[in-house]
Amino acid sequence: LTVRSTAGITLAHGAVFAGFPGGKLVAMSLFNGNLGWEVTVSQPRGVTELERMTDVTSSPVVNNQFVCAVAYQGRVACFAINDGTQIWAREASSSAGLTMDNDYVYVTEEKGIVAAYDLLSGAGMWKQSRLGSKKLSSPIIRGQYIVVGDDQGYVNLLRNYDGVLVARSAT
């Protein structure tokens, strides 16, 4: 079994970064296709096939130092871009995705939660649960705000530094 998601690839720094079912993340050379490294974002856990689904569910996000990814029923984790060394990992579950800026990694978690983690340490900075149990889109950064859509047709605007919901508008 795999999670139906919009997982994709990210091209950056002469490499292709891609997440796969089973919680794997790989970096391959864009020039010759050679595998640079392969890491585990999240290990499958549980007894049943449903419990063991830990697919990387969105495109990895990349900056000059790190590549970060999130797995369904698993973890959000960041790795060194050059060799795949794990920098940090935290328990999280997302079928929507994540994004990052210079300070934080933002994750749309299950059950309508948006969370921010410190980019360097993985420390939890804030969680916004006021959006209820809505199905949320992958987060997008717009200036000092995090934007997420929901399954009721609303666009939600959160402050990036504390997660406060500052605006909500129907589409």
Predicted regions and their residues:
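Extracytoplasmic beta-rich repeat domains
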Residues: 1-13, 38-62, 87-101, 125-143, ...
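Structural signature of WD-repeat beta-propellers
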Residues: 20-21, 64, 71-72, 109-110, ...
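Short loop/turn segments that connect beta-strands within beta-propeller blades
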Residues: 29-33, 80-83, 118-121, 159-163
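Conserved mixed alpha/beta catalytic, RNA-binding, or beta-rich assembly cores of soluble enzyme
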Residues: 102-108
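C-terminal closing repeat unit and adjoining cap/tail of repeat-based domains
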Residues: 121, 145, 150-171
